Amino acid sequence: TPLGPARSLPQSFLLKCLEQVRKIQADGAELQERLCATHKLCHPEELVLLGHSLGIPQAPLSSCSSQSLQLTSCLDQLHGGLFLYQGLLQALAGISPELAPTLDTLQLDVTDFATNIWLQMEDLGVAPAVQPTQGTMPTFTSAFQRRAGGVLVASQLQRFLGLAYRGLRYLAEP
């Protein structure tokens, strides 16, 4: 069954993951709130076209839905997605001095979560032979693009984490 190895995930790992997801969601929400309050960029849906023109990629997480949950590919997609968001958050560097600490915290928490997933994949013997490499990241040429990118990346990260949280909770059920 696709769920077979899921039951071998340590409960402590799952609980730590759920805690990390909640922390990153709080960090992301803070970034979104500050971009809204400071720069009046409050509606990611209004920036979708700009996101396409900037080439902001999205991370899939289809292997973690409860209907098609497959542990190895779910962990792989989760790690790959977090790795993608690490790169996107780095691309936002210089967004604004007042947002830098929030962005730094978000980056560190995403990196910690990605590392946690990778170590668990190694423990299970399912980690790829090499760590993924960062693809082409968008280049933000103006302060507005960087701030709009921040809204879009934070919004996409929240959606990604929502899916991750549901998948992990499903795995954590006895």
Swiss-Prot record:
GO terms for molecular function: cytokine activity; granulocyte colony-stimulating factor receptor binding; growth factor activity. Gene3D superfamilies: 1.20.1250.10. Pfam families: GCSF (PF16647). O-glycosylated. Keywords: Cytokine, Disulfide bond, Glycoprotein, Growth factor, Secreted. Disulfide bonds join C36-C42, C64-C74. GO terms for cellular component: extracellular space. It is found in: Secreted. Glycans are attached at T133. Its main location: secreted. SMART domains: IL6. It comes from the Eukaryota. GO terms for biological process: immune response; positive regulation of myeloid cell differentiation. Belongs to the IL-6 superfamily. Granulocyte/macrophage colony-stimulating factors are cytokines that act in hematopoiesis by controlling the production, differentiation, and function of 2 related white cell populations of the blood, the granulocytes and the monocytes-macrophages. This CSF induces granulocytes. Monomer. This is Granulocyte colony-stimulating factor. It comes from Ovis aries (Sheep). The lineage of its organism: Eukaryota, Metazoa, Chordata, Craniata, Vertebrata.
